[in-house]
């Protein structure tokens, strides 16, 4: 039987009245069944990309778990595609050993009315690197929880996240980066568009732990509101337990203004077409970065 569970809790809570301390999801925990649990290991000198396709398999409340390990000096690109017509939970566990480089291209794409829960965890050792490109383009509800630890000195992370939410869809994202090692670097870029009655929450937390001296972290989000009833909540947070660090965050939220509409109209493009063009532009940069159809 379905009950309410709470996911995407940030590292630091804020006022409850803001409605961003957690996401409530209707989920049948008793019916949840493990559909697959697979592991992959990359070694230095092997560069063939790994493709993961996580689907519901026709079962409601299925769960799929994937563990990817990059050994010292290895380089690996992972393409992960999650599709769901039924409620689906997927988990991707990443480990990068010393000097390893992981590049993850992720597409979260539920069909209309479906619920997709996705969890990503990553542990980066000394001088390891993770590049994450995450696209959320589905027609249903996506709850994405990314927990990344820069544990080793000199570990580096870049995240490029894009979303497009329409109708009454939900995009709920929690991204927490713990910077533990010395001279670690994190860089987060998020952008997307909300149409009609769509709702989006993005919680981006950079957490400088004691001992992370010399580390740098930044996050930025650009949101385009294309629906009068669209609802956006952006929660950038920087936590600091170390003095010699540098952190920054920012957000830009814009709408389709009269000047932009006039520009499109003068070229024979009506409002609906203009919104479609701008919504596509909000995420197509990431699609080009993905380098995979």
Model-derived segments and their meaning:
Residues 1-33:
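Short, Gly/Pro- and small/polar-rich lid/capping loops
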């Amino acid at each position: 039987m379905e009950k309410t569970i709470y996911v995407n809790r940030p590292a630091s809570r804020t006022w409850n009245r803001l409605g961003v301390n957690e996401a409530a999801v209707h989920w049948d925990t008793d019916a949840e069944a493990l559909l697959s649990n697979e592991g992959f290991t990359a070694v230095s000198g092997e560069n063939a990309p790994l493709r993961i396709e996580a689907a519901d398999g026709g079962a409601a409340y299925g769960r799929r778990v994937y563990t990817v390990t990059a050994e010292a000096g290895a380089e690996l690109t992972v393409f992960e595609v999650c599709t769901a017509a039924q409620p689906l939970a997927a988990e991707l566990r990443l480990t990068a050993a010393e000097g390893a480089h992981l590049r993850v291209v992720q597409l979260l794409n539920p069909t209309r009315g479906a619920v997709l829960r996705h969890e990503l965890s990553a542990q980066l050792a000394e001088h390891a690197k993770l590049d994450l490109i995450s696209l959320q383009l589905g027609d249903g509800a996506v709850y994405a929880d990314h927990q990344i630890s820069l544990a080793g000195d000199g570990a580096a992370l870049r995240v490029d996240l894009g979303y497009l939410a329409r109708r009454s869809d939900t995009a709920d994202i929690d991204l927490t980066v713990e910077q533990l090692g010395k001279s670690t670097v994190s860089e987060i870029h998020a952008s997307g568009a909300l149409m009609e009655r769509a709702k989006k929450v993005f919680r981006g937390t950079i957490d400088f732990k004691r001992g992370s001296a010399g580390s740098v972290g930044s996050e930025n989000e650009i949101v385009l509101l294309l629906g009068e009833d669209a609802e956006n909540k952006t929660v950038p947070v920087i936590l600091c337990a170390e003095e010699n660090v540098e952190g920054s965050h920012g957000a830009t939220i814009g709408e389709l203004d009269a000047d932009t509409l006039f520009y499109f109209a003068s070229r024979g493009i009506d409002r609906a077409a203009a919104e479609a063009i701008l919504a596509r532009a909000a995420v197509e940069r990431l699609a080009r970065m993905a380098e995979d159809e």
